[in-house]
Curated annotation (Swiss-Prot):
UniProt cross-references to InterPro entries, sorted A to Z: Acyl_CoA_acyltransferase, GNAT_dom, NAT10/TcmA_helicase, P-loop_NTPase, TmcA/NAT10/Kre33, tRNA_acetyltr_TmcA
Organism: Aeropyrum pernix (strain ATCC 700893 / DSM 11879 / JCM 9820 / NBRC 100138 / K1)
Claim: Heme is one of the keywords in the record: no
Principal subcellular localisation of the protein: cytoplasm
Protein name per the record: tRNA(Met) cytidine acetyltransferase TmcA
Recorded catalytic activity of this chain's protein: cytidine(34) in elongator tRNA(Met) + acetyl-CoA + ATP + H2O = N(4)-acetylcytidine(34) in elongator tRNA(Met) + ADP + phosphate + CoA + H(+)
């Protein structure tokens, strides 16, 4: 058999059919085959390979395996993956979404009998799963160059009209759209053109925010760039901030912006690029659109967030509410998609009035494209929960990795619930579930369908240190070597969206605790950055022991870790760690925890053990404090004394109510040092004076009630 003839025939057939296909070449000479495939694509390709094995000049773009985002947003005749060893699902999913109609996604690897795409010391189930998935691909060719045989092949007959059928000349604009036809001609689908019209109305109207959503490959970012060009042309914007995870991630927006400015004939603008060539600022005589990193971005007359799930819901909320207008894009399904749960959350946090639009047609390939469907199915990029069974009959079960690897329906039903636990999911989550020997999946099953799922990770001395995410932080906070301590970390737990607030999550958690206790674990831990779920863990008897000093780069919130002891050793460690956190929250509240929501700081502090405060008043400070308590001076005039006395009271007692507005205001003002203008907003006071009055009244009351505590802590 002529291997090269088979490969070239497959590629030619793809071009004629306008389908996209998967090509897998098993070979002992990866470099030679990568060069051949790049030649078939005429160099119009993206190559994913290690820097050490980079093949200069064979493809238009290159990305190392750890930076697949370098090629995302690009469009190529082929994407070629030549990665030895571990082949992460995110590499396949990300590269596959860059291939245009009639092109191919190629994986160049070892021959099938020697190819192991999984990690070292894994279970081997990812290899089994991926091999089965390749054979199931409806348009693929898997060939073994060494033996000269076809491992498997398939070519689905498919007819359809895709985005290539889009004709700007036949497009009928909406009445009063105001968008020049020459700008519409820059669109690549009708849904892009409709979205452009809607965004033009958004810029002209009184809307505060707009949400553009859709699966990956629908042209969301590009049409936002066209809309920005329209707004600049109409002089509807001046200064705008463009926020995304990296400069690379916003290049589709910048490409649409520059294309739109060119089409509209807007000259005289200046383009600033990074040393790597990425556009980070476009400015003209009356407008300036500049990229800012999520953690440094400031409010602006217009803020544009490209990929909200990657920026983080907390940052999106902060930026949008403090800016004039907000334009936000989020990916529902696809590589780094957030799922519909997050897409449904965004309208609740964006300022009103608000418009929402969704792009449905792919711009690079046919709708219903078999490669897209394969990627979405195999790597759970469109996983949504199934219809739930009767929850009253639910029973706890452990779902084995073997079942997950071999029964795709079970995997989809489990994964469809788990994706609700995170704002942003990646295909690599699947790799961990199948390959890590320390992962466990537990579920509440009703009528054969999961209604609640927990993803659990075992952490102990036999696990690599970098994988002991919560345990290492717990031992650090406790100041304990913790040799031999084993904990179970609940990485994710979620309940079917139609069955929440019925106690199913707590019931499943109790089952996990029982299994952990039976195995000899000392604690169950968890760590997350979705602060809205803190009450769930506190309700179930967990104590906080760690809050990260920095934001989680995904959610824009700080990571919070909690634990529940299962034996005396675990209880002793957690007690020490939680007391350490109490001191950190109180004493570092005005620095590293100043940006933590005051109500969350109060709630977490209240659920730590009472501890003796290492704080004392001088005689002069005690005198100043008495003056404040008698109403002779305001709190700010005796702030140092109020600070010491209030922190001592909050640390040593737990009789205070963490949700009382006065307490929350006192925490915001005294512990965190926030201005009264912000305190007023936090506690719902209509004026600054009202906020001052409420906070000072509360402080006087709590300090009078704890007089015996702080009055005995005066330095002679």
């Amino acid at each position: 058999m002529d291997v090269e003839l088979e490969v070239s025939g497959f590629i030619q057939r793809l071009r004629h059919s306008r389908l996209r296909g998967l090509l897998v070449v098993g070979t002992g000479d990866v470099k030679a085959w990568a060069e051949k495939l790049a030649g078939y694509a005429g160099g119009d390709c993206a190559l994913v390979s290690p820097s050490a094995g980079r093949l200069p000049g064979i493809c238009r773009s290159w990305a190392p395996p750890g930076s697949i985002e370098r090629i995302l947003g690009g469009e190529y005749a082929a994407a070629i993956i030549a990665v030895p060893g571990l082949l992460r699902p995110s590499i396949i999913a990300g590269a596959g979404e860059t291939v245009r109609s009639g092109g191919f996604l190629a994986i160049v690897a070892d021959p099938p009998d020697r190819w192991d795409p999984g990690p070292p010391r894994g279970t081997g189930l990812y290899r089994e799963y991926l091999f089965s998935a390749i054979r199931d691909n409806p348009v693929h060719l898997w060939i073994d160059d060494e033996s000269g045989r076809i491992v498997s092949e398939s070519f689905l007959e498919y007819t359809g009209v895709g985005a290539q059928g889009w004709s700007p000349g036949r497009y009928k604009p909406s009445p009063g759209s105001g968008v020049p036809r020459r700008l519409v001609s820059a669109c690549r689908s009708e849904s892009q053109a409709r979205a452009l019209e809607s965004l033009a109305r958004f810029f002209r109207g009184r809307w505060r925010s707009a949400l553009v959503r859709g699966d990956r490959g629908r042209g969301k970012s590009y049409v936002i760039g066209l809309a920005l060009a329209y707004a600049a042309w109409r002089r509807l914007i001046g200064r705008a901030v463009l926020v995304g995870p990296t400069p690379l991630s916003v290049q589709s927006v910048m490409a649409g912006l520059l294309r739109g400015l060119d089409v509209l004939g807007l000259k005289g603008h200046r383009v600033v690029r990074t040393s790597g060539g990425e556009v980070i600022r476009v400015s003209g005589p009356w407008f300036r659109i500049a990229y800012e990193q999520p953690d440094t971005a400031e409010p602006s007359p217009l803020v544009v967030v490209d990929e909200a799930a990657a920026v983080g819901v907390a940052r999106v909320r902060r930026l949008s509410w403090r800016s004039g207008k907000s334009l936000v894009a989020t990916t529902i399904h696809g590589y780094e998609g957030s799922g519909r749960a997050f897409a449904r959350l965004l309208p609740n946090i964006l300022p009103k009035p608000f418009i929402e639009l969704e792009l449905r047609e792919p711009i690079r390939y046919l709708p219903g494209d078999p490669l897209e469907e394969w990627l979405y199915t195999v790597f759970m990029l469109r996983a949504e929960p199934q219809e739930p069974g009767d929850p009253s009959a639910a029973r706890p079960v452990e779902v084995s990795r073997e079942v997950l690897a071999r029964d795709r329906e079970v995997l989809r039903s489990v994964y469809g619930i788990l994706v609700q636990a995170h704002y942003r999911n990646t295909p690599d989550d699947l790799l961990a579930m199948l390959e890590s020997p320390h992962h466990r999946i537990y579920a509440l099953e009703a009528d054969g369908t999961p209604v609640a799922v927990a993803d659990v990770v075992l952490e102990g001395p036999d696990v690599e240190e970098e994988a002991r995410i919560a345990l290492e932080r717990l031992l650090y906070m406790a100041g304990s070597p913790g040799s031999g301590v084993v904990s179970w970390r609940v990485s994710r737990i979620a309940v079917h969206e139609d069955l929440q607030r019925r106690g199913l999550g707590s019931r499943l958690l109790r089952h996990v605790e029982a299994q952990a206790r039976e195995s000899g674990a000392s604690l169950v831990t968890t760590m997350f950055s979705r602060h809205d779920v803190i009450p769930f863990w506190l309700k179930n008897g967990f104590k906080p022991f760690y809050v990260s000093p920095r934001y989680n780069r995904v959610t824009g919130e700080k990571n919070v870790a909690l634990a529940k002891p299962l034996d005396s050793a675990g209880a002793e460690i957690l007690e020490k760690a939680s007391k350490t956190l109490a001191l950190k929250l109180a004493l570092a509240g005005s620095s590293i925890y100043r940006d933590l929501a005051a109500e969350k700081l109060a709630l977490l502090l209240h659920h730590t053990p009472a501890t003796a405060p290492p704080l004392y008043l001088t005689r002069i400070q005690a005198r100043h404090l008495e003056g404040f308590l008698k109403g002779e001076v305001m709190a700010d005039q005796a702030f140092d004394a109020v600070y010491i006395a209030l922190l001592s009271t909050l640390l040593a007692t737990r009789s205070w109510n963490p949700v009382e507005p006065g307490l929350v205001g006192a925490v915001a003002r005294v512990v965190q040092g926030k201005p009264y203008s912000e305190v007023a907003s936090i506690i719902g006071a209509s004026t600054v004076d009202e906020a001052v009055g409420k906070v000072e009244e509360y402080i006087r009351g709590i300090l009078e009630g704890a007089r015996s505590l702080w009055s005995g802590r005066v330095i002679p």
